[in-house]
C-alpha cells in the first residue's frame, strides 16, 4: 500500500511539472510595462517641459537655474510654445528660441514627478 501511494504521489508530481512546463504562466502573457520607461522613451533625448526637473536644463547655458525654475513652475504646458506666454525677459526669449528644438511636451506623469518637487528632486552630486 505504501508503495502504491508513493507511485501515485510521484506521478502527480511529474504530471504537475509537465503541465507547468507546457502551459505558460499568465504573467508572461501580459507584458509588464514601466510607466516611467515609456515616458522616457516618448521624449527621447529632449527635455520634457512637463516632467523634467530643473537639473535637466543644466546642459543649456544661461537657462539653469533661474530660467529653468521659471519654466518648471510655469507648467503644465500643452505645447512647447506655451513657455512664451510666461513673463520672460528678452534675453530669456532669445535663449528659449535658441534651444527650442531640444524641448518636448508630454502629459504630466506622477512617475516622473514624485512628490511634485521638480525644483529640488533630491539628486545630489
From Swiss-Prot:
Pfam families: PsbU
Matching InterPro entries: PSII_PsbU
Gene Ontology CC terms: extrinsic component of membrane; photosystem II oxygen evolving complex; plasma membrane-derived thylakoid membrane
Superkingdom of origin: Bacteria
Bridged cysteine pairs (disulfide): none
Membrane topology: Peripheral membrane protein
The keyword Transport is assigned to this record: yes
Listed GO biological process terms: photosynthesis; photosystem II stabilization
Protein location: Cellular thylakoid membrane
Keywords: Electron transport, Membrane, Photosynthesis, Photosystem II, Signal, Thylakoid, Transport
The UniProt record lists the keyword Electron transport: yes
Residues of the signal peptide: 1-29
Role description: One of the extrinsic, lumenal subunits of photosystem II (PSII). PSII is a light-driven water plastoquinone oxidoreductase, using light energy to abstract electrons from H(2)O, generating a proton gradient subsequently used for ATP formation. The extrinsic proteins stabilize the structure of photosystem II oxygen-evolving complex (OEC), the ion environment of oxygen evolution and protect the OEC against heat-induced inactivation.
Assembly with partners or alone: PSII is composed of 1 copy each of membrane proteins PsbA, PsbB, PsbC, PsbD, PsbE, PsbF, PsbH, PsbI, PsbJ, PsbK, PsbL, PsbM, PsbT, PsbX, PsbY, PsbZ, Psb30/Ycf12, peripheral proteins PsbO, CyanoQ (PsbQ), PsbU, PsbV and a large number of cofactors. It forms dimeric complexes.
Stated family: Belongs to the PsbU family.
Protein name (database record): Photosystem II extrinsic protein U
Organism: Synechococcus sp. (strain CC9311)
